[in-house]
A protein has these predicted regions:
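N-terminal Sec-pathway targeting helices
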Residues: 2-15
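Hydrophobic membrane-insertion alpha-helices, especially the h-region
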Residues: 12-25
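Sequence signature of WD/YWTD-type beta-propeller architectures
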Residues: 26-517
């Protein structure tokens, strides 16, 4: 009896092994290209367009699909050292094994990465396309990208969340979802530099009201006021944030029919240990709109955007002259030891540029200031004219980056080593925001960007959600989503006295115009 059972077990094991081998064989086809394929004098059409780009040596596999008619497909990925990676496909989808990819790109930092593409046509002939050449940078990118993921906002939202993605692979985890606190809205996530230990998230809920979650030193507290765009002082002692009266409206026609106006705004300063909010006079001028704060890495200057209020009625939407409003780039000195502010000064004026200056962010080495400029207003993601510019802070000279498209480029952040930027772009058709990564060298030259790699190379083809506000951080968000949600629902909060009146009412799904996409 035992012998019979052993024989049956052996047969089952053998059959199981055969099934597994067949499955692997079917999933990973192998084709013999032949010694002399016909040469095609152009690069293959692939999606995403991972060609002529500079990539980090720690990025996830850059899977792609070959958009050429054929019966079979092969890709050979190789560099100066190490074994080549060969991937065969019946569909044109090239999914690169993670371990082999890591070994290849980490071994060849600073060198070229070659991709040879072969396609077998209906006549059973193999075609070889012109080689794709990319470059592996010597510098890695911060490991984690934190972003907001949601459908485009018109008149309502259903669901939104903040997620974090490990850029070295395809792992994605939820930081917090609006469903966890009464279908609320969450945005304006920010960090102290590229570290994940200090994080804030702005919340609005029809049930729980408006507040801000502050995660710091392993604890999470709820502050009884909603922060807008936030900038942490490098010391971690204080944060400057905006309060904004943002409203959305619509145009009858255009490449982008949505528009946003900030009817009133100011900058406030929150002192962490004292749990106190102050309003420096230079940052809350009643005749101007202050927004988008960012600190210099040494903490000596706060940079921000400031524009004149061109309307008397601060409730009408859209207000008079909304399309004539242009913001200047300003800065103000600060002494953290004495808590003393200097006088605000203009770094770059809208009169000089002819455009509205938005979203300043300084590289961690203090050398460059990355910012957006658009025709008017404060919301570049809704402005097709919005482009990225880079200022050399040593000289004050700035230039338009070559990586711009005909569509909107907007939210952006720096990697901790000042060599990489993540930014939002609508270049895939003008409607949906995607995250792109680009290398910036020591002279300020930016190289051709590439869209955030996905495990499925066709991922973006049918995706209707947007990736927004990409923040690069070195580590990862450790605080759990359950702790964040529980704190958001809690009645306990840190009470703060706001020295000036804000404009952030409770909001439900019918009021998306109070937020940013």
């Amino acid at each position: 009896m035992q012998r019979l059972m052993k024989r049956k077990l052996a047969v089952i094991v053998i059959l199981g092994s055969i099934v597994v081998l067949l499955a692997v064989r079917l999933a990973s086809p192998s084709f013999e290209v032949g010694p002399e394929p016909f040469q095609i004098a152009r690069e293959p059409n692939i999606s995403p367009e991972y060609s002529g780009v500079v990539i980090p040596g720690n990025i996830a596999p850059m899977n792609f699909k070959i958009l050429e008619e054929g019966q079979a497909y092969c890709a050979r990925i190789h560099s100066a050292d190490g074994p080549a990676i060969e991937v065969a496909s019946r569909t044109g989808q090239i999914r690169i094994p993670l371990r082999k990819w890591r070994a290849l790109i980490q071994t060849n930092k600073g060198r070229s990465l070659f991709v040879d593409v072969y396609v077998r046509n209906a006549e059973n002939e193999w075609l070889q396309f012109q080689r794709i050449v990319n470059t592996i940078a010597k510098e890695d990118i911060d490991r984690t990208l934190v972003y907001r993921f949601m459908r485009p906002v018109y008149n309502a939202w259903k669901e939104m969340g903040i997620y974090q993605r490990d850029l070295t692979d395809f792992d994605v985890s939820l930081v917090m979802n609006g469903r966890s606190f009464g279908e609320g809205c969450l945005n304006c996530h920010s960090f102290a530099g590229d570290a994940s230990e200090t994080m804030t998230i702005g919340l609005r809920s029809p049930i729980y009201g408006s507040s801000t979650l502050l995660a710091r030193k392993g604890e999470v507290h709820k502050i009884g006021a909603k922060w807008g765009y936030t900038a942490w002082h490098p010391s971690g002692r204080l944060a400057v944030y905006s309060i904004n009266k943002v409203r959305q409206f619509f145009h009858a026609a255009g490449l982008e029919v949505r528009d946003v106006v900030d009817l009133d705004s100011a900058l406030l300063c929150y002192h962490v240990e004292a749990k106190k909010v102050v309003s420096p006079e230079e940052l809350a001028d009643k005749n101007r709109l202050e927004t988008y704060p960012t600190w210099s890495p040494d903490g000596l200057y706060l940079y921000f955007c400031s524009g004149p209020i061109l309307w008397k009625d601060r409730n009408t939407v859209p207000p008079a002259n909304y399309d004539k409003l242009k913001y200047d780039l300003c800065r103000i000195s600060y002494d953290v030891e004495t808590d003393q502010w200097g006088k605000a000064e203009t770094v770059l004026s809208a009169d000089e540029t002819g455009s509205s200056i938005m979203l300043p962010r300084i590289s961690p080495d203090g050398r460059f200031l990355l910012f957006c400029m658009c025709r008017y207003g404060c919301f570049p993601v809704y402005q097709p004219s919005s482009d990225l510019y880079l200022m050399d802070l040593a000289t004050g000279k700035y230039h338009k980056l070559a990586i711009n498209s005909r569509y909107s480029e907007s939210w952006h952040s720096w990697s901790g080593n000042s060599r990489w930027i993540a930014f939002s772009s609508k270049r895939q058709g003008g409607s949906l925001t995607r995250t792109y990564l680009a290398y910036v060298d020591q002279t300020g030259q930016a190289y051709r960007p590439f869209v955030l790699p996905q495990k499925d190379p066709t991922y973006y083809d049918s995706l209707l959600e947007t990736f927004s506000v990409p923040e690069l951080i070195a580590g990862s968000v450790k605080v759990s989503k359950s702790v964040l949600a529980r704190t958001a629902r809690s009645e306990a909060s840190v009470a703060v006295d706001i020295p000036i009146t804000g404009a952030t009412p409770k909001a439900g799904p019918s009021e998306p115009w109070l937020e940013r996409e």
